Every structure is written in C-alpha cells, then in structure tokens.
Amino acid sequence: DILAVYWLQKAVSNGETEAAQVLNRIAIRAKPASWAKTALQFLTRESVSSHPFLAARIELAAVFGLSRPEALLLDIHSADKGHCLLVDIREHYRRSKRKLILIQTGRERQTLSRIGRLFEKVDCGPNGPEGNYRQRQYRLKTLLPAPVPEHPEDTVS
C-alpha cells in the first residue's frame, strides 16, 4: 500500500480524480494534533535542550496529528517513506492501527527530514536513550507544567 500511495499521488498530480478518491481511502492527510500544539507552547529552550528527542516527537505530533502513544513510540527511521509517513506502533501498543499519513507540503517534508536527522544514529527502541514507553510517558508528563488533555480526535482508534 505504500507503493500504491506513491503511484496514486503521481496520478492525482496528473489530474486523475478517481485516483484522488482511492488515495483518500487508504491514506489520511496530516492535520495538527491539538494536544501537541498545546504542549509545544509549554516547551522552553531549557526543556528542548534537555529533552531534544521528546521535543522533536511533540513537534512531529503537532505537524502530522499523531496521538500521544504514536508520538512516543514511532520509529522515526522506518516511518519516513519519502512521500508518506507510516505510523505502525502495533508491536509496542496493541490497541493502535497502522496508518499512512500523506506528506503534502514542504513544511511537512522539512520537519520530518530535520527530525529524521536528529534521530539518525539513535536507537528509537526501548533500549535507546529515550527508554521504554512508561519512561517516555513520565518524561512527557513531568516536562509539561499542567495536564494537557488529549481530545477524542487525537486518540488511537
């Protein structure tokens, strides 16, 4: 389906309306996650420098509309497919569903490339510097001064 998204995007750029309908069924468009946009407002220069990976994950969620589990567990290396973002955290979070998010703007591409460079030589798994899911959740909760509610549209279905 990743390759299909690529070719469907090509067809849409050539004016194929049927391809656009099929593309909308198998991939979603990026829309900001409200919890992450709120969380970005609480990030200070000190918190970004002390937790650069967490700050990058929050920014990624703000741009692509990731839920908290998706943002905290996403393997950045394998998620970037060039034309889309593959969000598949089922190995670590059983309740999640695999999804493809289209990369449509230059800003989305730049953000993903910059964050990809940050994570370039980093193990994104539980043995890496970020720790396991619980450690990442704790760090997120302690980094933000007040509880940032996750709205129903941001949750993993």
Question: What are these language model-derived features?
Answer:
Residues 20, 30-68:
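Basic, Lys/Arg- and aromatic-enriched nucleic-acid-binding interface segment
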Residues 13, 43-49, 77-85:
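Solenoid-like repeat scaffolds
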Residues 73-111:
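Conserved tyrosine-mediated DNA breakage-rejoining catalytic core shared by Y-recombinases
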Residues 1, 14-18, 22-23:
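Short helix-capping/linker turns of helical repeat alpha-solenoids
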Residues 26-43, 95-107:
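DNA breakage-rejoining catalytic core of tyrosine-based enzymes
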Residues 104-157:
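Active-site/catalytic core of tyrosine-dependent DNA strand-transfer enzymes
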